[in-house]
Amino acid sequence: MMIQSVHAKRLEFDNVILDLSHLQLHGPPEERYIVFLNVKRAFYKNFCVECDMSLETFALHLYETARLTVDGAVVPRAPEFAHHISFNSADRDQSLVLDLGPDARIVVAKQLRADERYHQRASGFLDFQRRHERPPAPIEHDLVARNALDRELEIKLYTLCES
């Protein structure tokens, strides 16, 4: 298991808290995954993990482990998880989307390269969505430009979510 900052495993905005900071993994690290937390369809964080679970098993573990709080109340998981977990065809079925509610979701993806990492905000998820492009899509490395892009994306996505 890789050691990750607890900060990257918790995302909060507008009274919606998506928390995986208590995630526990055991067993030898055989598979590598990237986990994206998403709140209000606009705000993103991600972290990498190594574990001994298949993509499907790990997705179910995340679904059952995630703590979602909206306006101070914990939102219980729906027992029929199969209706809330789906393959991401845009990612060639290399990831699963876990819909936890209208304002929160998790995307768990197989790590395709050992060095595969993404920026922590919306532009990082945008880069992830283009990870199969050949030649590889250019990645913005200028932090000022990336922060401006993140702000623009977050405002647009949040506005769409709220309308």
From Swiss-Prot:
What Pfam families does the annotation carry?
Answer: DUF918
Q: Which organism is it from?
A: Orgyia pseudotsugata multicapsid polyhedrosis virus (OpMNPV)
Identify this protein by name: Uncharacterized 18.9 kDa protein
